[in-house]
Curated annotation (Swiss-Prot):
Protein name: Protein translocase subunit SecE
Gene designation per UniProt: secE
Transmembrane segments: 64-84
Biased composition regions of type Basic residues, renumbered to the chain: 20-33
Highest taxon, organism lineage: Bacteria
Amino acid sequence: MTDALGSIDMPDAEDETREKKARKGGKRGKKGPLGRLALFYRQIVAELRKVVWPTRNQLTTYTTVVIVFVVIMIGLVTVIDFGFEKAIKFVFG
């Protein structure tokens, strides 16, 4: 990168060797495909435990709101389509 003075910011050689060493080794790097798959599923379960699930009452409310909104949008699109149909028939006969 170039700063305001025009000098180039170069990483040190020590930083590069530390990064390379940090990527090597570790428990994750030595597991086979089945071990990585098991780790993946364990992480999924751990993340799903963090989810705050809605109560039955909240779920019913949200579902009702979505269905009402969809019905209103269907009605709106139907009215607009009917209006365009009448306008096209009026213009083109």
